[in-house]
């Protein structure tokens, strides 16, 4: 995900201007929004162009080498167009790698270093306080469209997956108090947000680090616990979509909330593989045979449930037989939304030492076969929706048509619903659409 801050409508000749680039995952986007909210509160304006700004901030991603390359390219572009650049984010946890290529940066900070970023901005271009510039909306600055927002409930992760370096970049799990999360969510909904996308490194582990401590919300105490938070969010009147949910046993508890319509019938659950031996090398939870049984039970409780997952092919030492286990599993699981990635060595990840690396051409072929198998599953599931009426949230609208998403589709990572409408629709509208045609990823229909 790449996001660039849009300028505000506020005018002020003395206000210093910031250009901002946000790279990486939705969690990083929330970090960017927090930094921008702080700076806007101090009177800084936002610039669409690097060459029109007093300083450029680049929030980097450092998870994969390809992400690092994208981050370094973004820094280079900012240096070429402006020259006064502050770097933050996950790649900032390895400053020597950045400084080696760009020694003249104003500052390099790691992830979650909000105060350090703001301090670096102050040093580069002090704020020009103005009572008219210092006003910001109560929901803060958002880099998403107005009708949806990411809601980060925790930081860090207690898992030690062998392919991942997130704990070394962002630390162990730190959960926000439930009351704080709910107050932020309420502000977003009051500001017009129709869809809350709950994110973290490990959403279903929420509150474990605090022993599920309670905090005040309205006239009662609410525990920092996965189910309790989901239930309370479901009372706010917006779509609530759960992301990055690990398959812990207590995930079963939220399925009835989905069946009751309290939260969306959607689970983003990164399973990564299906072969027991590969999962063991990954240090990933879950017995996939038992997981199939759980998925069946979930669908009995909530027939409309859509499960999204991601998988890695070409993990070190992955054999043909282990890959075939994965193919057999996805055919049987019939997941609604699936992504696939070729394993990419990450500096510092213990997976690099696990076994023989799978050749690039083999990884590419396995990904092709995986996505081909999943496309057949997806097409059957999508065609079953033809003739049905679905609720669709509109993302983009034109004179005679629009593009939106059903309850089974998250922004940017899932498919779309292409809508023909005889009446005007706007982004953020939730309309009923009769589905007339389907392909493997998108649906087509008419607003009714």
UniProtKB/Swiss-Prot annotation:
Domain MTTase N-terminal: 16-126
Record-listed E.C. numbers: 2.8.4.4
CDD domains: Radical_SAM (cd01335)
Residue stretches making up the TRAM domain: 383-448
Gene Ontology cellular-component terms listed: cytosol
Keyword Iron-sulfur listed: yes
Disulphide connectivity of cysteines: none
Biological processes per GO annotation: tRNA modification
Cofactor note: Binds 2 [4Fe-4S] clusters. One cluster is coordinated with 3 cysteines and an exchangeable S-adenosyl-L-methionine.
Localization per Swiss-Prot or TrEMBL: Cytoplasm
Domain of life: Bacteria
Known catalytic reactions: L-aspartate(89)-[ribosomal protein uS12]-hydrogen + (sulfur carrier)-SH + AH2 + 2 S-adenosyl-L-methionine = 3-methylsulfanyl-L-aspartate(89)-[ribosomal protein uS12]-hydrogen + (sulfur carrier)-H + 5'-deoxyadenosine + L-methionine + A + S-adenosyl-L-homocysteine + 2 H(+)
Residues reported in the UniProt entry to bind [4Fe-4S] cluster 1: 25, 61, 90
Function: Catalyzes the methylthiolation of an aspartic acid residue of ribosomal protein uS12.
Alphabetized NCBIfam families for the sequence: 30S ribosomal protein S12 methylthiotransferase RimO, MiaB/RimO family radical SAM methylthiotransferase
Annotated family: Belongs to the methylthiotransferase family. RimO subfamily.
Protein name listed in UniProt: Ribosomal protein uS12 methylthiotransferase RimO
Species assigned in the record: Methylorubrum extorquens (strain PA1)
Gene it is expressed from: rimO
